[in-house]
């Protein structure tokens, strides 16, 4: 069975402003997501599932989904603040979505095969989809054995400012032992560095694997996520800004010994429009890839 690509497209794009998922950056107005879908199809994926907010469904169907429907089956699910397990209600005053792993849970009703999870607004690159697609095709019928694409941190930096990245630690066999979210990572005087929680400057090696939220799971992940989400809600219901992130869930499963996560290396560079000032650079990078023959000028 071919794997499914699950696209997280419910985010607001707060730092950049506007619906950045719909921003045309390619030579014929292609979005970053168009390139991900194109790469996924040629990487062996057989279905798309988008998680979006109900409020922009019409726009999304007209501008985005209509392009793909003749190339690959497409389904849409919705992330909603009130979509909570039985016995829980959304606290008054909460506006922030419940986080990426809550968004992933929305796919439970429509996904029964190994699946990848990606952000809608990151350009992941051809090699990453080829590597992940191959791994997922070997995971059919398995349980508790997941994977993620580990980007080399030097291939993920923004020229317009610092970035936050999940810095990965691995064991000798290449399995994830933990992900630590680090903020304000940037290249200064040739060194990639960040400041840790003690105010100390830490230099990262160029090839240090980081998570760009490109994961590979099997359907049993939904069951674990549902159970842990209840624990998360009990502990965090009073915090209106708390979020249930994928790395939180993954770290818990690894720490408990419930599952293992293979870190897949990729030569791809990952980039996106973190800041409005990034936009032109992304346009130029995509054009360079088209000029080099990596992508056709018109995708769909």
What are the functions of these language-model segments?
Residues 1-7, 27-117, 124-125, 129, ...:
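Conserved N-terminal catalytic core of the sugar/cofactor nucleotidyltransferase
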Residues 4-17:
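A phosphate-binding catalytic loop at a beta-strand-loop-alpha-helix junction
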Residues 12, 122, 153:
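Active-site metal-binding loops of divalent metal-dependent hydrolases
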Residues 60-64, 132, 225, 282:
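Hydrophobic packing residues within well-ordered alpha-helices of enzyme cores
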Residues 126-215, 219:
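Conserved core of the sugar-phosphate nucleotidyltransferase
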Residues 226-259:
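A C-terminal functional module that forms or caps the active site or interfaces directly
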Residues 279-298:
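Long, low-complexity C-terminal extensions of enzymes
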């Amino acid at each position: 069975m071919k794997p499914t690509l699950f696209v997280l497209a419910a985010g607001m794009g707060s730092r950049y402003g506007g619906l950045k998922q719909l921003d045309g950056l390619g030579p014929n107005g292609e979005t970053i997501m168009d390139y991900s879908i194109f790469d996924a199809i040629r990487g062996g994926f057989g279905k798309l599932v988008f998680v979006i907010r109900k409020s922009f469904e019409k726009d999304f169907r007209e501008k985005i989904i209509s392009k793909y429907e003749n190339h690959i089956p497409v389904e849409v699910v919705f992330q909603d603040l009130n979509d909570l397990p039985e016995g829980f209600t959304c606290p008054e005053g909460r506006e922030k979505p419940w986080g990426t792993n809550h968004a992933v849970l929305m796919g439970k009703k429509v996904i029964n095969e190994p699946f990848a999870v990606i952000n809608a607004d990151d350009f992941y690159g051809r090699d990453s989809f080829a590597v992940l697609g191959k791994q997922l095709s070997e995971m059919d019928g398995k349980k508790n054995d997941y994977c993620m694409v580990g980007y080399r941190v030097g291939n993920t930096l923004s020229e317009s400012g610092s970035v936050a990245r999940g810095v990965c630690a691995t064991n000798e066999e290449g399995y994830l032992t933990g992900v630590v979210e680090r903020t304000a990572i940037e290249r200064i005087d040739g060194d990639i560095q960040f400041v840790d929680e003690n105010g100390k400057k830490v230099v990262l090696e160029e090839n240090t694997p980081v998570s760009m939220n490109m994961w590979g799971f099997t359907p049993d992940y939904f069951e674990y996520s549902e159970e842990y989400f209840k624990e998360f809600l009990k502990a965090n219901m009073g915090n209106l800004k708390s979020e249930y992130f994928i790395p939180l869930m993954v770290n818990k499963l690894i720490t408990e010994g419930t599952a293992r996560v293979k870190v897949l290396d990729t030569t791809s560079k990952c980039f996106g429009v973190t800041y409005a000032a990034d936009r032109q650079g992304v346009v130029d990078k995509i054009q360079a890839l088209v000029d080099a023959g990596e992508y056709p000028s018109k995708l769909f």
